[in-house]
Amino acid sequence: MKRVLTALAATLPFAANAADAISGAVERQPTNWQAIIMFLIFVVFTLGITYWASKLVRSRSDYYTAGGNITGFQNGLAIAGDYMSAASFLGISALVFTSGYDGLIYSLGFLVGWPIILFLIAERLRNLGRYTFADVASYRLKQGPIRILSACGSLVVVALYLIAQMVGAGKLIELLFGLNYHIAVVLVGVLMMMYVLFGGMLATTWVQIIKAVLLLFGASFMAFMVMKHVGFSFNNLFSEAMAVHPKGVDIMKPGGLVKDPISALSLGLGLMFGTAGLPHILMRFFTVSDAREARKSVFYATGFMGYFYILTFIIGFGAIMLVGANPEYKDAAGHLIGGNNMAAVHLANAVGGNLFLGFISAVAFATILAVVAGLTLAGASAVSHDLYANVFKKGATEREELRVSKITVLILGVIAIILGVLFENQNIAFMVGLAFAIAASCNFPIILLSMYWSKLTTRGAMMGGWLGLITAVVLMILGPTIWVQILGHEKAIFPYEYPALFSITVAFLGIWFFSATDNSAEGARERELFRAQFIRSQTGFGVEQGRAH
């Protein structure tokens, strides 16, 4: 039976995202037993790790940050595993398959945010915080308001990501494995809850590390086989691809994805600063022992991800040659079976046969599990640590805080499953773009200015943060993706697809204006505390260190 996957085009603008979704109507496929067996091996192995981790999780520090005992190299792999999703793998290779060189340019947008994290954020974040980025933002500002804002920003980003990820998981698994959509969503939700509930950050970290190794191995093998086919010559690779692609030499020309400079700038800023405001990524810097290891984490993560994106570029061009030119992978209408996002999966079959196809399918599923586990832990910590322990019940014991965290994991898991089922046939591609815009417009400005600007006050952070968050949401709703494609209006009120340029500007201006005009005694006290914060951020004096179990 031929595979039919329609309506994938709508997801391509965000397909390269680290947590994007595969959306559209999917026809259920014959059961892929090789893929299911390989995935079951992965599940059994990772559940064994979760059991091992559960024996070591004795405290709040163990649960949230694995006791701070993850090394820089391990954390770098885990960050890469958290950031590289199934849609990142399938989406970027699909963009290269359809658009050529533009696919590489688009993928770089997700990479350029990491030098910002390396040079501006990683060390100071580790020296100032313990469990969440709200620890840093509220270091010298009023705990209650800042933690509520930070938690809201985190939970909105996590919720949008989780919905996109769960729907993407259901669609992808239905396509690759032949499993029922609802079964797939429930399976992902249950496994996600088990990893986080029992193993905490330690189990989540190792699931992400294993997934990163498997994905990098699979992508490396595919790229190697493609290069072997062309005699390890990039000249031959590009020449053969241009010879068979419908666009010919145009696939080597940039500029086809984004139509105007404003959209290009807004997209770039959203990707760059959004990465530096993602709660599940920032949380990973508290799992290492000190600022030096945090810096090494970013160094290794950037290397792994840069290597991965180079591989997807080769895989995309390989798919043009070995898949696009092969009628075996086309339907009766001449379109790629399963849609363009299946280009890498078909290439896996072309270079490694059915067994390797099963392996890549299992890796795609494992990838989803690793990402949703990190998201769930970030959401749970925002509720239990930021809201419960520091706002609603100050002085709560570690045991009470952990209990609230685990209850939150269960609630988030159930909500994710329910929303995954409800959004089955909805266009959810915009959710990822909105999550990035909110992270860039609310979380990032507050984190950056709280660490670097001595005149920041609680009033400025609150007004600017809320303005950035609301502006991002409103402009996204009024833009072409939601206002026209989803709500059905003829013309968008806000003409640009990506709101980040405007919402980030509003956030920074709001923070500056309301801080500069804050003449209160509280504001003066917060400015005076900057020097002590600066010393702590540079030296790490007083920071909670990793400890041996």
From Swiss-Prot:
Its main location: membrane. Keywords: Cell inner membrane, Cell membrane, Ion transport, Membrane, Sodium, Sodium transport, Symport, Transmembrane, Transmembrane helix, Transport. It is a multi-pass membrane protein. GO terms for cellular component: plasma membrane. Gene3D superfamilies: Sodium/glucose cotransporter (1.20.1730.10). PANTHER family: CATION_ACETATE SYMPORTER ACTP (PTHR48086:SF6), SODIUM/PROLINE SYMPORTER-RELATED (PTHR48086). Transports acetate. This is Cation/acetate symporter ActP.
